[in-house]
Structures are given as C-alpha cells and as structure tokens.
Amino acid sequence: DGVIISSPHHAHFENAKAALEKNCHVMIEKPMTTNVKDAEILIELAIKYNKEILIPNGFNFKSFMSKAEEIISNGLIGEIKHLDAAFSSSLIDLFQGIPLSESNNHTFQPHASTWSDPEKAGGYGWGQLSHMFAGILKITNLDPECIFCLSVPSPTKVDYTNAISMKFTNGATGSFSGSAFVPKNFGGTFYITIHGTIGTLYLDMEIKRERLFVRLNDENIIEHKIKEGDGAYSYGTKEALNTFVDICLNKNVTNHSNGELALKTVKILEAMYKSLKSKKLERI
C-alpha cells in the first residue's frame, strides 16, 4: 500500500515515480525532488492515482507547528508583512565529504556524497533548509515570488551557509539563514518570527529556549507552552511515519507535509541555487 523512499536526493524522483505508478502511497525523504519539473510530475501522478505524498519533515508534525498555523490562519496577527527564520545544525563534516560521525556505529552508513556532491543536490539548502521552508510554508500558507542568496562554500563546493532574502506574492518580505557551523551534541537552532499588521508570532525550538507566543499591538500576549526539550532537541520522524501508516490504512488523518508543500519547497530551493550561481535575484 505504501513505499518509503530514503535513497540519495538525486534518486528520489525515479524511485517515487515507480512507486506511484504501481498505485502506492509514497513517503519521500526530503527534499521531494531536486528540481521543479520532477516534483510537478510526482504531483500529477499522485492526483492521477489518488495517492498521497508525504515528506517526513518531523517539525511539521509537532503540535506547536499546528498551533502556530492556527494562530496565523485565524488572523490573530493580521496580514503578514515580514518573516525571519534560521536553521542551523552540526553538519560541517557531511558537507565537506566526511561521513557523519553520528553514524559510526550504525549498520549502514550513508554515502557522504549525498550531501557533499554539488552534482547530486548536495549542500545545506537541499539537505537542511528543506526542513525550514516546509515549516514556514505550513504555518503561513504564503507563496514565494523571488529570491536572492549568498553562501560560504565547503571544500567540495557545496553550500555550508545560506543568507537569503525573499519576496512573497502577497508583498511580504523574508530574511532566512542556514548554517552547518554548530557544535556537535547540541541539537541545533530553528526559529521562525512572523510579523503582521496587528502582532508578531515567535516560535523558537532551540533547546532551553523553546517558546510559542504572540505579542499583539494592544499589548496582550497569547502563549502556547512548549515543554523543554520538545523542540529541535527532540526532532524525530515517528509522528510522520505514524501518519503515513494511517494513510496506507485509509484512515482520515492530516498530512502536515504533503506533496503540494514539498513542491513549493523545491521551487524555493531550485531558485535559491540559481541565485547562488548567477549572483542575481531569481524568480521562483
């Protein structure tokens, strides 16, 4: 009933296409594909065969993400005017072609080229910012319009860092950051701040800093408690996998990281890498 795709980035499309054509639901490791054309083909196949695509972006399945989405969709901060977000993790080894040290004792060790080869969609954007943008797009439901990006390259010529400026179709602006330079055994950083016409939403997932609250222009505060350790430090894909199993069992569940969301993410990342090469603003 369902197929899980956990192959290297550049092989996702071929594997997922074959599974959908066999009438199976698919769970595809992020990113869904490494170019927009392939992502659109998978969406078309999913519609044709009435199948679900799920990307296990674990943060999207956290309750605080759904709460943030609810706050925004209910208009509690008004019209979105600006976003800023950052995602950082301890992965300089991967992006310079050294196998991930955390996998030393695993039965199978992934090839480092998955993340370090620029010809195989290596780099921090494809490998990590897919998480960040999936979360931002889920919460805001915005559509990206254009993007500019600067980066620090690794020895293998993939991106270690990303400094991104973006414009959305509703006129809002965004400033986004990615970095592989975080000490090991920390859990990394992931925060999203969304500024609206009547308030600002703050979502922070860094260890010992976890919080979700809204500060309104009338000085009222709306707070949703996040337990310490339940943010970036507790990242996992259990909730996503459970949802996928329920989808295969034909249960009525919410797919918090579906194919349409993944397509938007791929559109952003493809344009981001175009900007890195052209050193110009690129349309999405």
Q: Where do the model's predicted regions map?
A:
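Beta-loop-alpha module in the N-terminal Rossmann-like domain of NAD(P)-dependent dehydrogenases
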Residues: 1-45
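Hydrophobic residues in well-ordered beta-strands that form the structural core
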Residues: 5, 28, 53-55, 84, ...
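C-terminal glycine/acidic-rich active-site capping loop/insertion
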Residues: 58, 100-112, 190-260, 267, ...
